[in-house]
A protein has these predicted regions:
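Metalloprotease/metallohydrolase-associated module, dominated by Zn2+-dependent proteases
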Residues: 1-50, 66-125
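Active-site recognition of the HExxH zinc-binding catalytic motif
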Residues: 54-66
């Protein structure tokens, strides 16, 4: 798999658009033991103790392209992170941080963690 700068830009824009369009409950922070992020059809979970920005791109790419292999997802994540300008990364992080804050604030206000059965997205490896 090869991605030129135009394709990388499209992936970035699609990921940013997805962050903007999903409800705050779609993005969750939690401590994880053996992974840094998980992608389900219902939400994306990120370990807040790890590299959130690359992990968020990685999990969003799993959501956007469930047919891609893990190596293709890692490649796309690396290309986006290394091709984006600091302003593009900051813009992505701002929208993601706003969603994460709203979700965590709602959980705190309600006094409990949101829990539900999840169906993991299956993808080729």
């Amino acid at each position: 798999m090869k991605l030129n700068k135009g394709e990388v830009k499209k992936l970035y824009e699609e990921a940013l658009s997805l962050v903007k369009s999903k409800p705050p409950e779609f993005f969750n922070l939690r401590k994880m033991r053996d992974t840094v992020g998980l992608c389900y059809w219902s939400d994306i979970e990120l370990d807040y103790r790890r590299d959130i920005i690359p992990t968020a791109f990685h999990e969003l790419f799993h959501y956007m392209r469930p047919d891609w292999s893990e190596s293709n997802i890692k490649y796309a994540e690396s290309r986006v992170i290394n091709t984006c300008t600091p302003l593009e990364v900051a813009t992505f992080f701002k929208y993601l941080a706003d969603k994460l804050f709203e979700c965590e604030f709602k959980k705190e206000q309600s006094g409990h963690q949101i829990s539900h059965k999840k169906r993991k997205i299956k993808y080729n490896q």
